Amino acid sequence: LYLPKEAQYEYLLNLPEDISVAGLKDKDDNDMKSLGEVVNNAMSLIEEQSEQLTGVLPNSYTDFSDEILSELLRIFNNSALDEVGGDVIGRIYEYFLNKFAKNIASDDGVFFTPKSLVKMIVNIIEPERGILLDPACGSGGMFIQSGDFVNAMGMNANSAMTFYGQEKVEYNAQLCLMNMAVHGLTGVIKSGDEANSFYHDAHNLEGKCNYVMANPPFNVDKVKAETAANAGRLPFGMPKENKNKEIGNANYLWISYFYAYLNETGRAGFVMASSATDSQGSDKDIREKLVKTGHVDVMISVGNNFFYTKSLPCSLWFFDKGKKEELKDKVLFIDARNYYTVVDRTLNEWTEWQLKNLNAIVWLYRGEKDKYTALLQEYRKVLGQAIPFEEALHLLKSEL
């Protein structure tokens, strides 16, 4: 991405303290009298260089005083950021998304999926090449983690993968596009009414996706039944409509969509309300048809308090249309409701080692013993580097 001089960090950092007397002009040749106007102009210049970011970057920096903006520029003028290298800015962006989600005590926080759940989905799906769709993409966590996974294998995620997303809330879609940009990823994200997955297949991807990953909103009601039916992607039929000709709970619409988007060897992984595993009526009928396909692969029960805005438990579902023949009549169930690490009073997560342990169960189920053996070797290496208890105690006493 080419950045004009006026959009470069060094230029902004070295501006005079009093912008009003600097005689600066924006890209449209208007006078700029505040640092906020200068930063807004920088955002506009960046958008001109990137079709993906057009209309996405914030343009309200004039809401902040010059003193606050100057201090922020100074804080990020830190040689430590350059020395660390790698995807530092991307990780900083993720950190603030995380903090933002924690401070939203409502369903508005559904734009953010906890990282340990995203990692679990990506680790089991193991994306390599092809089309990845998230039809409820929020801030894009599935794309970021998938990109990291592919890059870690020595490939270039932008060359190997094509990322597509739908997100009804335009603000969340902007978060997603910025998140992808700072992580060096490109993708096609649709937002607004045309991206309402209940009524639109915005990218025309039914039957074409190698991978589908999502954390859809749970238990959505008042979905217009006729409009949803006309939008298709319902290989197992429609959930029952109520007297108002609405779908009272859309969980099985989502589940049907995730299956319908897959190609003949595609894999899907998604978060779902725990209640969907045993809901009755038309949901049960759809679930029975789904199981009979032989493509349900893994189900993981997750405990309470994994979300910032919800305390209820959830489940992770996985489909695999390319399952080995000997696994076609099998589904792996993992009860991980009591397996977690407490972060604080209201939040739990899976640590890296807990993720590896859960992943190991899936490998053994699939007969991938080489991956399991490699993990054992990793365990042995880490344990071999551990400091003996007596030595650790001595070090602790010396520090005290």
Language model feature labels by segment:
Residues 107-214, 219-230, 237-241, 252-253, ...:
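Conserved S-adenosyl-L-methionine
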Residues 1-128, 188-203, 301-304, 327-336, ...:
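Non-catalytic, mostly N-terminal accessory regions of nucleic-acid modification and defense proteins
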